[in-house]
Curated annotation (Swiss-Prot):
GO terms for biological process: translation. It comes from the Bacteria. Gene3D superfamilies: 3.30.70.60. InterPro entries: Ribosomal_bS6, Ribosomal_bS6_sf, Ribosomal_S6_plastid/chlpt, Transl_elong_EF1B/ribsomal_bS6. This is Small ribosomal subunit protein bS6. The keyword S-adenosyl-L-methionine does not apply. One of its GO terms (molecular function) is structural constituent of ribosome. Keywords: Ribonucleoprotein, Ribosomal protein, RNA-binding, rRNA-binding. The keyword Ribosomal protein applies. GO terms for cellular component: cytoplasm; ribonucleoprotein complex; ribosome.
Length: 96
């Protein structure tokens, strides 16, 4: 059974456009492999952070909306924790 989720994650501001695109594609592919569908991704661009995170004052915001089983969300968050590119993330379940 799948549920609707929204995930917002913040990438380091010093990444190149190529690495940003590769990172976004990696997480979209990870979700698809875990049974998520459809993955809608919005690249929100570089924004100033309200406070410093891991010594960064800016971050690149990316939002994903998708239907997925809870195991897919767990795998995605595990990948975020292990990634050096992601400085913060949040996943919430959308209400119908």
């Amino acid at each position: 059974m799948s549920t609707k989720y929204e995930t917002m994650y913040i990438l380091r501001p010093d990444l190149t456009d190529e690495i940003i695109d590769q990172t976004i594609t990696r997480y979209q592919t990870l979700l698809a492999e875990q049974g998520a569908a459809p993955v809608e991704t919005q690249h929100r661009g570089k924004r100033r952070l309200a406070y410093e995170l891991k010594k960064f004052k800016e971050g690149i915001y990316v939002q994903m909306n998708y239907d997925a089983p809870t195991t897919a969300v767990a795998e995605l968050e595990k990948a975020f924790r292990l990634s050096e590119e992601v400085i913060r993330f949040l996943t919430v379940r959308e209400e119908d």
